[in-house]
């Protein structure tokens, strides 16, 4: 299921590039030339907690690395599949893309071979960004991004449409 979700997410993020109303033509050209997307995490800290792994332990770091590697590999596999279907990003050069010293050069051999043969749809695929608001709004209060929960409960201040601040209690649901 994780693999399928990643493939769906990469396809959706690639589709967003095509339907975005870019404010400037220069922005559209840049987006189309590189087709950068940013698949990332929310709730990793809570996932580790639900697996009964303390965030600051070797076991938790090993699990986080395993999850991250699976997400990375499936995202690159999905983008290579999209390249076969829709074409590689216009600036793609396989030798340069897979050369030593960059992120793609550290991919597993089978993925590098797939990219050599099919190309890759998106120049960049992963983004580990802060996801506080997204975690609260769309992930039922999951922990932010790759971070552990800083508190099981806290108060969040939100500016309302009339300009006033209102406080809301927030509870991490993985607890």
Task: For each feature predicted by the language model, list its residue ranges.
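Long, C-terminal-biased catalytic regions of enzyme "large/alpha" subunits
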Residues: 1-175
């Amino acid at each position: 299921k994780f693999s399928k979700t990643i493939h769906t997410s990469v396809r959706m993020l690639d589709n967003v590039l095509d339907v975005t109303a870019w404010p400037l033509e220069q922005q559209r050209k840049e987006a189309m030339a590189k087709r950068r997307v940013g698949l990332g995490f929310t709730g990793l800290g809570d996932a580790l907690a639900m697996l009964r792994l303390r965030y600051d332990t070797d076991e938790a770091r090993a699990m986080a690395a395993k999850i991250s590697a699976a997400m990375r590999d499936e995202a690159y596999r999905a983008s290579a599949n999209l390249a076969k279907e829709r074409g590689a990003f216009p600036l793609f050069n396989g030798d340069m893309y897979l050369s030593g010293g960059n992120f793609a050069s550290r991919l597993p051999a089978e993925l590098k071979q797939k990219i050599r043969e099919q190309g890759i749809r998106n120049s960049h695929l992963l983004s580990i960004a802060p996801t506080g608001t997204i975690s609260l709004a769309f992930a039922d209060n999951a922990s932010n991004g790759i971070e552990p929960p800083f508190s099981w409960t806290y108060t969040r201040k939100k500016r309302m449409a009339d300009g006033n601040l209102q406080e809301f209690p927030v509870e991490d649901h993985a607890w």
